């Protein structure tokens, strides 16, 4: 079976496709013990206006069709929900693997992740793996709409931290002299928080969403450490994995649940 090429996130995969609120953090769930952030009920702006998509495509030398999945921008109303403050790390995933005798990622040393990667987002997990973890933790995967609201708040901002790209706010590959070295610890970019205080939602590892755009496929949000353009690191950017059983070095996940 053909697997999605890692660089597809950065280009044609997209075609296939707040006001600051001081909010309390949610209680940890009993199974994975990790903090979740409350995202309040209400409307938010999802996607990108057609005129803005055209401007961005010209500015970043992309074909406008690559942004087609984001257009038109629309106002969506969502009920309150909670979302993990950070992506699921190798450390957290190891607890699940050992508790459930679940198959670990292939690059691990048996059921133990490489020690230097403990606090990095878990990768080499497909969407079924992500859902299995979420079920164990008493959670679920977020929808693309929930993910986007948690990332951009209600003011329609371009990036989780604002409308201007900040090279120090996320893990990326934007013209750096050295080749990208992979993921980073999920706490490595404190300047990258969203209006709600959700972290690491741009770059590092792209994240599986619950939506099914087509049979066997899935939406990805957040860009990744391989991203070579700010265009793919925006809150509204939407990638698509043609196969939701892909296990790749740039795809991870975080969980959500009802408030």
Language-model-detected regions and their locations in the chain:
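Short capping motifs at secondary-structure boundaries
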Residues: 81, 88, 94-106, 137-138
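Functional-site microenvironments in short loops/helix caps that host divalent-cation chemistry
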Residues: 39, 45-54, 58-65, 103-249
């Amino acid at each position: 079976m053909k697997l999605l090429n890692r660089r597809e996130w950065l280009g044609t995969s997209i075609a296939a496709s707040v006001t600051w609120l001081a909010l309390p953090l949610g209680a940890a769930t009993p199974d994975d013990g990790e903090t979740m952030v409350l995202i309040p009920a209400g409307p938010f702006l999802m996607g990108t206006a057609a005129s803005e998509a055209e401007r961005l495509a010209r500015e970043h030398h992309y074909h406008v069709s690559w942004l087609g999945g984001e257009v038109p921008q629309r106002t969506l109303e969502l009920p309150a929900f909670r979302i993990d403050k950070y992506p699921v790390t190798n450390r957290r995933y190891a607890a699940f693997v050992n508790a459930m005798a679940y198959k670990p990622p292939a690059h691990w040393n048996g059921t133990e992740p490489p020690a230097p990667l403990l606090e990095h987002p878990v990768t080499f997990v497909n969407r079924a793996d992500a859902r299995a973890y979420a079920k164990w933790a008493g959670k679920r995967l977020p929808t693309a709409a929930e993910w986007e609201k948690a990332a951009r708040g209600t003011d329609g901002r371009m990036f989780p931290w604002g409308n201007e790209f900040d090279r120090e706010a996320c893990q990326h590959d934007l013209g750096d002299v050295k080749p990208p070295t992979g993921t980073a610890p999920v706490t490595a970019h404190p300047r990258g928080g969203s209006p709600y205080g959700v972290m690491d939602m741009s770059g590092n590892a792209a994240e599986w969403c619950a939506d099914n755009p087509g049979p066997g496929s899935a939406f990805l949000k957040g860009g990744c450490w391989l991203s070579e353009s700010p265009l793919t690191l925006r809150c509204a950017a939407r990638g698509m994995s043609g196969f939701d059983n892909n296990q790749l070095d740039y795809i991870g996940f975080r969980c959500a649940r009802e408030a």
